[in-house]
Amino acid sequence: MSTGHTIYHSLLKLPLSVMVKSSSIPSNPIEDLNIDLERPIIYALPFRSHVDLLTLQKSALELGLPDPLSPIEIEGVKYPRYVFTSIGPKMFDTDDDLPQESLDLFKIVLKHHADNPDADFQLIPTSILWGRKPGKEGTSKPHLMPLNGPQKFVTLIKAGRDSTVRISPVVSLRYMADNHGSDEAIAHKLARVAKIHFSRQKLAASGPNLPNRQALFNRLLKSQAIEKVILEEAKSRNVDVEKVRKEAMGIMEEIATNFSYSLIKNGNRILKWLWNRLYQGLNINNASTVRKLAQEGHEIVYVPCHRSHMDYLLLSYVLYHEGLVPPHIAAGINLNFFPAGPIFRRGGAFFIRRSFKGNRLYSTIFREYLAELFAKGYSVEYFSEGGRSRTGRLLQAKTGMLAMTVQAMLRGLNRPVTLVPVYIGYEHVMEVTTYAKELRGKRKEKENAGQVLRTLRKLRNFGQGYVNFGEPISLNHYLNEHAPNWSESINPIEPQKPEWMTPVVNGIANKMMTHINDAAAANALTLCATALLAANQRALSKEDLTEQLDCYLQILRNVPYSATATVPSEDADALLEHAIKLDKFVIEKDTLGEIVSLDRNQSLLMTYYRNNIIHLFALPSLIAKLVVHHDTITVEQIQEQIKLIYPFLKAELFLHYEEDELASIVNNHIDELVQQNLILRDGDTLQLCNANIRKLHLLAHTISETLQRYAIALTHLQASPDLGKDELEEQSQIMAQRLSRLHGINAPEFFDKGVFCILFNTLKTEGYLDEDGAAVLSKVEPLSQDIAHLLTPEIKLTIHAVMTKED
């Protein structure tokens, strides 16, 4: 570097230290992007800019990356560690050709790779984004634009403290040299590819131009679909067309978002303060997959599970910090109250009524509005379950929004549409006490400002929060596979509902929910809750609880549930200490040590957190249950019984294992339990290990309540084979409530009618019911006997007593 540049950089550093505050995406690039610090690194920036270079230098040093201003040595000669892919404008120049010095460095590096087979330099494309404000409808400007001196100065004043250093995945120059050669044309190709990449990054970060709200309404009113329904409504109701048109405008005002970047930017500061006050940390996983989809131009639909009203804010906050545009969020009309409604609307919320069946005007306008969002390229978010889960378990999907998404594709969208399932987890859900009261029968309180203020008063440290992005689902690929002729149904005007629509949407919904559960985050509280709720009297010594946590951790680490599920990196001791600090347990001391327990009220609340991860332990718990209740059992017998029971667990808990991989997974879990010395193996025979029987019993108990529900329903079917769906659900629910009272079962979902509905549907699909809905006793009886063998004598006696009384 020349002396002049060195002096210039020194003079720039002081004002930049005051004017510029940058965040880096990703925040841990060495790990997230697999950057090898042992291999040489060269940075590629979009424009010749000393301000950008110095901003990169500051971030690189903070992140542990090489200083871009330190030279790189090639064959004994020192060269700059950076290249610019465009000259960028001078005061009166807009030339954007590849700078000669960058071209020369590319040629030198590529020749070095051609001459040295072991050389493998890493090229890291890096761009500095000065602000992320999207443009306005009707304006046109490039997504990434070079700035001359005066423009850069103005930008620094406006957006210097709203800048982002985007670090992209590494490009292997060894790969480029081996596959594309090392001549000058390749250097130009590298620069062109980098420019396209930088432009896509900017679009992914700021999003498409924001619409003029009034122009959007006028455009929707003129759409053929809405115009047609307005005329039909006016005719059927015998009213003036203008009156219906005015009504339509009112519906649009009620629905449409009024997105404000300034609110997002300023709200980010408030939310940062809020998260720091509420949580000890936010854990985000697999965000790079979503960034890649955004840069490839996908229409992204985020489909998170719904635990809390905080979900709305948390996901938008996380996406903003991951360099993505906060989505337009479908929110229930119940949240449109002052002052929250206007704030949510400016933060990207569009409001939807809970039900609009039979209201053609509303449904048409909403469908057209959603199609407009997709057509313009705005990312969208809606909650897969419709409402918040009161039990902590993933609910069955509400398919209305999903069906409208598919219908929007049938309007002729020219971009791929991809669902991104999102698992959101907390170590404390603010509404959990309210959920418990509602499950006991208290009427749900309508959302209002007073409720918000009461919640704010309770703000305290809630431990950790988790946002795990699941495996994306390409709707285009799914439709191609399950409805190969779907494109024949494309109609830009009339909403289509071809014969394949309902089964395909149901299939997508099930896959979506399964991918959400695949991305589950086990944490200190969910693991402690699982162990304590399995214990007699909901109490364990501190040592026993630590051992049980270690058992769970080994299972999750050694037999990973999925590629997107996450497991704490801490050991059992550290997790327990963290959980105790959350102040949710009763800690008692005696001469023998400490006892950790749950009081009756906390036992009910803790079921919520256990239910977040119960699916992770469904199979190992069932294996443990089979060993515990049979004392000695063969692997073949375990495989046979699990094959019978698994379809019910799969449907209820959204488990992802297919039938052809189930045996292998079961064997892996058996091997793990043997490795932990929880069971003993002699050839093909398994038996209890008395030394660790307590840990095996605790593991086995996790699935007990689920099996008890199955036993209740199957016992009813055996006694009354012709029992209809509604009767089976009602009678099973009554018996479950009785069991709950008599045996101290605190889990609110134990007698949830919806769970029995899922069970009935699975009985039908698995052939336990005939076409008329009557029980096929030749199949029901063996399953019922197998499950009954896994119940305690007390539970079996109660079920028998209730059935006798009913008879």
Curated annotation (Swiss-Prot):
Motif HXXXXD motif: where in chain: 305-310
Key word Cell membrane present: yes
Highest taxon of the lineage: Bacteria
GO biological process entries: CDP-diacylglycerol biosynthetic process; fatty acid metabolic process
Recorded domain comment: The HXXXXD motif is essential for acyltransferase activity and may constitute the binding site for the phosphate moiety of the glycerol-3-phosphate.
Pathway info: Phospholipid metabolism; CDP-diacylglycerol biosynthesis; CDP-diacylglycerol from sn-glycerol 3-phosphate: step 1/3
UniProt keyword list: Acyltransferase, Cell inner membrane, Cell membrane, Lipid biosynthesis, Lipid metabolism, Membrane, Phospholipid biosynthesis, Phospholipid metabolism, Transferase
Family matches, as PANTHER family: DIHYDROXYACETONE PHOSPHATE ACYLTRANSFERASE (PTHR12563:SF17), GLYCEROL-3-PHOSPHATE ACYLTRANSFERASE (PTHR12563)
Main location: membrane
Membrane topology: Peripheral membrane protein
GO CC terms: plasma membrane
The keyword Disulfide bond belongs to this UniProt entry's keyword annotation: no
Pfam families: Acyltransferase, GPAT_C
GO molecular function, one term: glycerol-3-phosphate O-acyltransferase activity
This enzyme's EC code(s): 2.3.1.15
Record localization: Cell inner membrane
Protein name: Glycerol-3-phosphate acyltransferase
Reactions accelerated catalytically: sn-glycerol 3-phosphate + an acyl-CoA = a 1-acyl-sn-glycero-3-phosphate + CoA
